């Protein structure tokens, strides 16, 4: 069976959609309360300090933004968590395509990530672990771009710095 490049992207987007829907819908229907770390981030978000006794501020900042948009709807925080994860999957897919020069292997690399505990069962709880994933994925991706260039572009170096700072603040 031949799989064409357009089909790989379709399979990838189907996978992202299924992941987003399942990992948003199931906790929304089965959990009575938000996870404790998400509630903690909501409490911290009301202060918007530059750090807290347990964690850096990024997760509280982002949860506060979502609270201002969606209010106290629990499903929104499960959705927020999955947005961070599927965005990370998207960056890993792009990174894998560039490294491996093969879209099938790039898709397999993302599907293998789905098998890692931190990309599935723990993702409904928006906490610092979920918050930092896209920042570190982007830091690695742009670091690879910088190291792969004969003469690094200033723009790419600044982007690495911005995403690394986002990772540290997560």
Question: Where are these predicted regions, by residue range?
Answer:
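Membrane-interface transmembrane helices that cradle and orient dolichyl/undecaprenyl
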Residues: 97-100, 139-157
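Start-transfer (signal-anchor) and selected internal transmembrane alpha helices
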Residues: 1-23
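Membrane-interface alpha helices of multi-pass inner-membrane proteins
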Residues: 47, 155-170
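Transmembrane alpha-helices of multi-pass, membrane-embedded glycan-processing enzymes
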Residues: 63-67, 80-91, 116, 132-135
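Short helix- or helix-capping micro-motifs
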Residues: 106-114, 164, 168
């Amino acid at each position: 069976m031949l799989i064409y490049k357009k089909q790989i992207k379709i399979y990838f987007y189907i996978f992202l959609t299924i992941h987003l829907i399942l990992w948003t819908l199931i906790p929304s229907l089965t959990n009575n309360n938000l996870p404790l770390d998400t509630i903690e981030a909501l409490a911290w978000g009301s202060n918007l300090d530059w750090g807290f006794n347990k964690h850096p501020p990024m997760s509280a900042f982002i949860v506060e933004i979502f609270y201002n948009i969606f209010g106290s709807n629990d499903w929104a925080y499960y959705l927020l968590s999955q947005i961070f994860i599927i965005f990370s999957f998207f960056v890993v897919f792009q990174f894998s395509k560039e490294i491996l020069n093969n879209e099938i292997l790039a898709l397999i690399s993302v599907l293998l990530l789905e098998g890692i505990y931190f990309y599935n069962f723990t993702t409904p709880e928006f906490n610092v672990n979920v918050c930092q994933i896209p920042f570190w994925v982007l830091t690695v991706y742009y670091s690879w771009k910088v190291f792969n260039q004969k003469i690094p572009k200033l723009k790419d170096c600044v982007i690495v710095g911005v995403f690394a700072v986002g990772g540290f603040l997560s």
